[in-house]
Amino acid sequence: MAYSIANNPLLRKNFAKIHKIIDIPNLIDIQKNSYKRFLQLDTPVDARKNSGLEAVFRSVFPIRDFSDTASLEYVSYSLGAPKYDVEECHQRGMTFAAPMKVKVRLVVWDVAKDPGTRSIRDIKEQEVYFGEIPLMTDNGTFIINGTERVIVSQLHRSPGVFYDHDKGKTHSSGKVLYSARVIPYRGSWLDFEFDHKDILYVRIDRRRKMPATVLLKALGYSNDALINYFYKSEEVKLGDNGAMTKLADAELLSNQKATADIVDPATGEVILKANRKFTKAALRKMAEHGIKEIPISEEEVVAKVASHDIYDPATGEIIVECNEELTQAKLEEIIQKGITTFQVLFIDNLHVTSSFRDTILIDKIGSTDEALIEIYRRLRPGDPPTLKSALVLFENLFFNAERYDLSAVGRLKLNYKLGVDVPLDCMTLTREDILEVVRYLIELKNGKGNIDDIDHLGNRRVRAVGELLENQYRIGLVRMERAIKERMSLQEVENLMPHDLINSKPVSAVVKEFFGSSQLSQFMDQTNPLSEVTHKRRLSALGPGGLTRERAGFEVRDVHPTHYGRVCPIETPEGPNIGLIASLSTYARINEHGFVETPYRVVSEGKVTDEVRFFSALEEEGHAIAQANAEIDKDGRFAADYISARKSGEFVLVGRDELELMDVAPMQLVSVAASLIPFLENDDANRALMGSNMQRQAVPLLRADSPLVGTGMERVVARDSGVSSVARHNGVVESVDASRIVVKIDEDQYDATGTGVDIYNLIKFARSNQNTCINQRPVVKVGDHVKAGDIIADGPSTDMGELALGQNVLIAFMPWGGYNYEDSILISERLVKDDRYTSIHIEEFEAVARDTKLGKEEITSDIPNLGEETLKDLDESGIIRIGAEVRPGDILVGKITPKGETQLSPEEKLLRAIFGEKAGDVRDTSLRVPPGVEGTVIGAKIFSRKGADKDARTEIIEKAEEMRLRKDEQDEIRIIRDSAIGKLKKLLVGKAAAVKIEGSDGKVLIPKGAAITEEMLKSFSMDRWDEISIADDDTIDEKVAQTLSTLNQQIDIIKYVFDDKVQKLRRGDDLPPGVIKMVKVYIAIKRKLQVGDKMAGRHGNKGVVSRILPEEDMPYMEDGRPVEIVLNPLGVPSRMNVGQILEMHLGWGAKGLGWKIEEFLEKNAPHDEIKRFLKGAYDNPEMDRFLDTLEGEELLNLARRLKRGIPMSSPVFEGASEESIQSMLTHAGFSTTGQVTLYDGKSGDKFMHQVTVGIMYFLKLHHLVDDKIHARSIGPYSLVTQQPLGGKARFGGQRLGEMEVWAMEAYGAAYALQEFLTVKSDDVAGRTRMYEAIVKGKHTLEPGLPESFNVLIKELQSLGLDVELLEGDED
């Protein structure tokens, strides 16, 4: 069985020391899973969970009319098949979406005269079309109007309750003021805050504040209840002789001082002296001696506050009210009335302050009703309050599920923070919640509890695609709900059907707007596979409901300890968005509540297990977590007694038995892009950030070359990005060509009677969003066996199934004639000659023929006033032929537009009379090649209106596409048929026939009782094989019949699919209104590396090509090999990205081993010798076993692949050590310094010092000088100021600002300056005169008034100032 090099991960020598515990989760699952949860398509209708789209429908329906006589109820929804597949949507500029139908039930009630009784009059159920909903492609993207878009996940503040303080900044005294905020998922915000006088206030929806007790009273609590809820009370007893004692409550006494000696009544022993603290020991001693009461002085009781009303026992009148301070007079009155016990509040102003009691005192509102009306007045100032409306408003604020939604996450966080146990399906606030929020805030002020850190990932959650779309759907449905209610009330409901009520337009409009113009719906970055993957894994704090760049402070942008393993601390954009846009770490995933989780290995009793569990930031709190590289002995126990670990965001040394968790892998800390940088651990973080970002800008090159020094992540990214073609089932490759691969599926992959074949049509030279080229190339051969998940075709920037963003080049670090000053790069012409850095870019141009007021535009090759030479590449339909080489100004699509009728001169009239009407009334509006574009036409697509006649070119294109489809159909049928024949032969050959079978001519083909042979079967059509009957075995007859019927069914399906595709092909296209025909032309532009192009390594070492030197002038080594790039050594020390040097050394070793293998091949060394060398180089028992299975040609194929160098993998944070690199260099026969002697290519002299030379992976970035260089002589002008426009895209000019004017003035260049400011810029009349002067050969300048001066005058006049210009030489 042949194997494929492409799918063998062993070929990359791995330096990792830690064995893999779990595979990296699929990199784009964050998108796919979220959308799957939103749509729930695979779930049966009745088993759908109340989440996603289902939840939206259930929350808005049932919709009742105003009089409650009818209701519209939701039953279920279903999605149809999309009208166009992904490929067709790309080509036609359509949205990839499925039609949605919703089943609703209209119930009409008969309302009886008695209140509360009603009966059903009528029920109607109907499926209603509900617009289209965009579907996600297999790669986690959406196709909207023909372009691929990504919905970026949003990182926002989680709903719940948050406690904070102002750090003493609000009030001049510097006093710390605490506040609490309850944030729902949707609904009113509730804020509690203290002011500098310690009064507690509340705000609803950030309106005017009022005492918090108003809200609590509105909930139905009285002053007494509130006082006793928030304070504890002490009982005071009055003795006969006027002595006072209070009950000894251990909880309240701790931290207080004794006011008098405490004596044991039985023995007279002093247990605690006066003015000493009640310590734990003292309290225990008191309990042992049975002391229940302690003496207090009268001064202590005065100024205490009564916790209940104190009544006169004789008359029942109130002496002291609840919450009233006891004065000396009141105390005497209590004693006089003979009251023996009363209760006071415990307030010591140290651990318990009087702030809540003070709040009650300033609050003058007594009853619940008054409180409700007060709240109504605050929220609706100007409306006359009634008790009923106030109650409704208050209920709707926090307790109505339609208006207020905490969400499951909010409820979870509330329960977690406040320690309450409310069921998770209770999504509104409860009275107890509000009381507990206030209690926690008061305790916080009293010094208990902690404030929340809003940047903690336990307080921020991710809203992925599904949830963002769910919110949009809710907005749309709420708009629709209003319209339905109005319709119900306007018309007689019993005569209506559900579809008369529902208009899905508002919903479709909201969804369309979200996908088309939301800040989080972005044009996919498709430069290379890595940029696609990173874009889908991005987390943004911006967007609707998030932060704004201007408002976001430093803390939000900073790296937080909880980011570890969840959000990458390295990858974030430079510039204003730094820290606001982040990337998910490699192993991170998002749980159903939207919190980011990271995996850890479980440690039990000091032993590391292979059990892996995912933890969110909150769940991880308090656990001690060891790092992945902590040393472990062979039994899985930690080697050292004390291990460095993380605990609650701090690094601590912990005993090995205290550890509970351990990291899964060292790279779990960083994102995908950062994990592709070898020796990341030796780079400065700022440069690593640039390196991660620049890898995403690498242009796919003509010849992809996977890195010699990688990190092992290359294969993962290539597989998950979706740019490569991946085998769907196990099987054998049946046929391969450049555009398709046919795989015959293994029999064990489908059921006994099924037959199978997979056809993979490869993408050839398609255009990406960034105009780079997408092209797939097969990496398997006929006869190769592939497993499901294997890569069978490479995409852009992938090589043998691995990500390949750049090229491995031979680099020397040395100055060379000043050409690598300040990060310039000197390159060898060899790189240009070998097309190492050549890339193909594809531009799309579009011509549209419209139906104008003056007549129809026409696409044709018959264009007035153009010569044969100009039209030589157009066919008769007026479209350029494929393969034509075009330059700026060439015609791509010939088009003429009718002109308005003009007054004709006599000469023109004569010409018209002679030559007919045509020539004069049309003008040439052909599509021409814009400046700066030069290339080859590689494709043209034509879209015509349904019912319009097709031109010759369309016919040719359709025919070619039909032939391709037919070939697929025939191959599929052939392979299925061959497979079935093989199966039937196994069943039939050698068995005895039970009946004879004759041909149409009466000739016996199979005699009765004869053993069936292959020749007999070949002699008649397979369709008649079901007539064969086998003697003594009925099961065979059944199997034969079943196999044949399955075969026929499958052939029917294939034919049906083919016919459907052909039908679609022949159908006209849906074009925008007013468009008759649309032509798209694709031009491939070959971009070679040239001076001015930007290049970079993977370590943030970027530069611009300054000179391309002939190969013979480059410095060369002793064996005559010239280096390919010369970099400046001064670019390394100050930037501290030493990783590039280590990468060079390891790459040098890898290349040296490759050269050694090449020597073996050249001298036809014995196979055993090659094997021995490879085993020594890899030093890996698994690789040894693999090499032992290879013989002959297979071994030589492998050696030929490895002669470019043995690929190495140096994973992030566990890369190759210095010793490993030195041993590689020794193995390759190089000096362990990694330096060689170089000779000057021009003079042949030896350079004085040895130079560091090695292989580095270098990328060409998407900042190409061809896209930036631009020149203008005459072009468009701005409408108002008449100054030239700016920028390449608008064909603009260079701006001459005021500073440039000063410079010209300083030089005294008056006439040049006058020219700049008038005829070369915005003097309209002067521009025309200049043209005339040049045409007539006069070289005089007549400047006039610049248009900007007129603009200034008009602006002054618009201010009401009468400005006039004086003409002539008036004084």
Swiss-Prot record:
SUPFAM superfamilies: beta and beta-prime subunits of DNA dependent RNA-polymerase. Keywords: DNA-directed RNA polymerase, Nucleotidyltransferase, Transcription, Transferase. It catalyses: RNA(n) + a ribonucleoside 5'-triphosphate = RNA(n+1) + diphosphate. InterPro entries: DNA-dir_RNA_pol_bsu_ext_1_sf, DNA-dir_RNA_pol_bsu_external_1, DNA-dir_RNA_pol_su2, DNA-dir_RNAP_su2_dom, DNA-dir_RNAP_su2_hyb_sf, RNA_pol_bsu_bac, RNA_pol_bsu_CS, RNA_pol_bsu_protrusion. CDD domains: RNA_pol_B_RPB2. Its EC number is 2.7.7.6. One of its GO terms (biological process) is DNA-templated transcription. One of its GO terms (cellular component) is DNA-directed RNA polymerase complex. GO terms for molecular function: DNA binding; DNA-directed RNA polymerase activity; ribonucleoside binding. PROSITE patterns: RNA_POL_BETA. DNA-dependent RNA polymerase catalyzes the transcription of DNA into RNA using the four ribonucleoside triphosphates as substrates. The RNAP catalytic core consists of 2 alpha, 1 beta, 1 beta' and 1 omega subunit. When a sigma factor is associated with the core the holoenzyme is formed, which can initiate transcription. Belongs to the RNA polymerase beta chain family. This is DNA-directed RNA polymerase subunit beta. It comes from Citrifermentans bemidjiense (strain ATCC BAA-1014 / DSM 16622 / JCM 12645 / Bem). The gene is rpoB.
